[in-house]
Amino acid sequence: MSIPLILASASPARKKLLQMVGIDPIVRVSNFDESTINADDTLHLVQTLAQCKAQTIAPKFDTGLILGCDSVLEVAGEVYGKPKDKSEAIERWQKMRGQVGTLYTGHALIDRVNNQTLTRCGITKVHFANISDETIIAYVDTEEPLKCAGCFALEGKGGLFVERLEGCHSNVIGLSLPLFRQMLTDFGYQITDFW
């Protein structure tokens, strides 16, 4: 019998990543108000948000592991979560094009049996293509960038505008699989315990 993994996220990309490696998570959306958190640096911000999301869901479960994640993109000192609307997405892309950004994904894992919590952060450098205003507008019109931290989906059309990555590919999608596996190991589990 596998150990239940509860994903405290509405992200279809995170769920799909877990399913690709043989884990079928129970999905519970935390609805945590992210605007209540202020942090001194991006790394601390994403780890705190991930932990708050997981902690919001944890009391609903007596067993299993709760996984919370949060991603933001930092470009030239500006931190980008999901854009509010199309005009903000266009403005961000005009600043991002031709630049190198840093994608931070905070991971929080709560073991309900042992009442322990781990937080970690995956960091990946993203090199963006220098695309035209027309391409930016066409991409934003697909509405894909409105659903993603950093205004792009690597696993979607946005992948066309990324020239290269330095670091973990799955981290950019929203969940670093190698980091998640290591967190399980740190708790004394194996990834196969969740198949």
Swiss-Prot record:
Substrates-to-products reaction catalysed: a ribonucleoside 5'-triphosphate + H2O = a ribonucleoside 5'-phosphate + diphosphate + H(+); a 2'-deoxyribonucleoside 5'-triphosphate + H2O = a 2'-deoxyribonucleoside 5'-phosphate + diphosphate + H(+)
Obligatory cofactor(s): a divalent metal cation
Any one GO biological process: nucleotide metabolic process
Top-rank EC class of the record's enzyme: hydrolase
Cellular location(s): Cytoplasm
E.C. code: 3.6.1.9
A Pfam entry, by short name: Maf
CDD domains to which the protein is assigned, alphabetical: Maf
Name used for this protein in its record: Nucleoside triphosphate pyrophosphatase
Protein species of origin: Microcystis aeruginosa (strain NIES-843 / IAM M-2473)
Lineage, broadest ranks: Bacteria, Bacillati, Cyanobacteriota, Cyanophyceae, Oscillatoriophycideae
